[in-house]
């Protein structure tokens, strides 16, 4: 018989830098799981992706055991890295902070494809292009 799921917790944590301090400690501690065990396992899995934020979806069971899956970095972070900017525009409809090429857009869309609700790469590109537009990044 399958274990009964107690909770599903979603966190965005810098790769290889999980520690029991807030926000991770309180989010997981209230469900009674081994926080250090999670941090160690997460850091081992994400050590190769240092410098990026990697979302994790942690499934916590009634017997206080857990499993987790890591997702691809947020599209906004990938776009900022490709454009070479620290932050998006405060007024995206009026000011453009950077420009990225269609090739860079396709590369980001192919990385994010498995996490997006898109049928093909063109659909994924449109989703990522919308994110870029809302950040004040122009695609040419």
Swiss-Prot record:
Which PROSITE patterns does the record cross-reference, listed alphabetically? RIBOSOMAL_L11
Q: Which UniProt keywords apply?
A: Methylation, Ribonucleoprotein, Ribosomal protein, RNA-binding, rRNA-binding
MF (Gene Ontology): large ribosomal subunit rRNA binding; structural constituent of ribosome
The UniProt entry's coiled-coil ranges are none
Q: PTM per UniProt?
A: One or more lysine residues are methylated.
Matching CDD domains:
Ribosomal_L11
Q: Name the GO cellular-component terms.
A: cytosolic large ribosomal subunit
Q: Which Gene3D superfamilies match?
A: Ribosomal protein L11, C-terminal domain, Ribosomal protein L11/L12, N-terminal domain
Magnesium found in the keyword field? no
What biological process terms from GO does the record include? translation
Would the keyword Ribosomal protein turn up in this protein's UniProt record?
yes
What domain of life does the native source organism fall in?
Answer: Bacteria
Briefly state the protein's biological role. Answer: Forms part of the ribosomal stalk which helps the ribosome interact with GTP-bound translation factors.
What quaternary arrangement does the UniProt entry report? Answer: Part of the ribosomal stalk of the 50S ribosomal subunit. Interacts with L10 and the large rRNA to form the base of the stalk. L10 forms an elongated spine to which L12 dimers bind in a sequential fashion forming a multimeric L10(L12)X complex.
Family, according to the entry, reads as follows: Belongs to the universal ribosomal protein uL11 family.
Question: This protein is called what?
Answer: Large ribosomal subunit protein uL11
What is the species of this protein?
A: Dehalococcoides mccartyi (strain ATCC BAA-2266 / KCTC 15142 / 195) (Dehalococcoides ethenogenes (strain 195))
Q: Which gene encodes it?
A: rplK
């Amino acid at each position: 018989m399958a274990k009964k799921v107690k909770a599903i917790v979603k966190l965005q944590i810098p790769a290889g830098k999980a520690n029991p301090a807030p926000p991770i400690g309180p989010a997981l501690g209230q469900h009674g799981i081994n926080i250090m065990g999670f941090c160690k396992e997460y850091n081992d899995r994400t050590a190769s992706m240092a410098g990026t934020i990697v979302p994790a979806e942690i499934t916590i069971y009634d017997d206080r055991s857990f499993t987790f899956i890591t997702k691809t970095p947020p599209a906004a972070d990938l776009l900022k890295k490709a454009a070479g900017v620290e932050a998006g525009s405060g007024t995206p409809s009026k000011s453009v902070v950077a420009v990225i090429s269609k090739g860079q857009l396709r590369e980001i869309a192919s990385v994010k494809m498995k996490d997006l609700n898109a049928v093909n790469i063109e659909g994924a590109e449109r989703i990522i292009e919308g994110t870029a537009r809302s950040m004040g990044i122009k695609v040419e």
